Amino acid sequence: MDILNLAQEIIHGKRLTREDDLSFFLTCDLEPLCQGADEIRKACVGDKVDLCSIINGRSGRCPEDCKYCAQSAHYHTECDVYDFLPEEAILEACKMNESEGVDRFSIVTAGRALTGEEFDQAIHAYETMHRECKIDLCASMGFLSAEKLHRLHKAGVTSYHHNIETSKRNFPNICTTHTYDMKVETLKKVKAEGMCACSGGIIGMGETWEDRLDMAVSLAELGIDSIPINALMPIPGTPLEHLPCLTEQDILRTIAFFRYINPEANIRLAAGRALLTNDGETAFRAGASATITGNMLTTAACATIRSDRSMLASLGRDVTPAYWKEA
């Protein structure tokens, strides 16, 4: 298989499916694989890099048993524990990210689903942000009903995040308190509501390369718009604490073949950027087109966002948010 020829075929409309033999992605030389992925990214997505930032709106005490997660109540970690944040803190974070040129801002909450009074608080916070800010708004609040997704959409949320985490085969090895199919059903509700669907996973949890390929194909089948790729950073106290970190080469290979299989999606760097050269610069030469940036309300957040924007601009990427262009 000539990987660069395949890249050109994808640019001209070919789409890879579950019926194709994708094993060549696991054995081909990394350099041409990344080169082809970057060509696909440029042709199918363009040079605009989508920057998003998150705030941990509610932390800890999660009843789910995801083996990688510090916020699970099943494990003894040093995770912060608090209820839904005051709206003032959320609005301050949103405005700070907007002032630094971030494209999207999301409230992320621990737990199976945000419900009751806390969900009402979230709706009010989104309505306020939508009224006072121009930044795009996203949410990540677990297994929500179609009715709750509609309320978020009406409040100004345009994208909903809900990771499938891994392949369907491997999912029971990672979590037993909910199922892969429940994840898929939630994403279908997101698409039905007309919101952008953001879903990816974590690599380096003991899965096989075939599991990663399967996850990439599953996301393509679901029509996912934004695919965050996290490289596991093992957390003390969790069942995966002793797993080794992935090599940079493994992360880049994964990002690259995700781009071949999902040519029009935003492939988004998430956790594990520290494992990559210059905090992810190499990934942006291997098919990545988006990243999570910043660090909530710390002083370091602004410095991190500015550093990311500078690095990306040096690669010739467009880091100007739409709301600045419209001003």
Model-derived features with residue positions:
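Active-site glycine- and acidic-residue-rich loops that bind
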Residues: 140-145, 202-216
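Mobile, glycine- and charge-enriched loop segments
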Residues: 47-54, 61-63, 67-78, 123-130, ...
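Core AdoMet radical
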Residues: 74-93, 97-190, 195-200, 225-230
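Conserved, mostly hydrophobic/aromatic
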Residues: 13, 37, 66, 107, ...
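N-terminal pre-triad scaffold of radical SAM enzymes
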Residues: 34-75, 82-106
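Auxiliary Fe-S-binding modules of radical SAM enzymes
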Residues: 1-28, 220-327
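Conserved strand-turn element in the central/C-terminal portion of the radical SAM core barrel
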Residues: 105, 111-115, 186-210, 229-244, ...
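Short, electropositive alpha-helical surface patch
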Residues: 119-128, 155-161, 209-225, 279-294
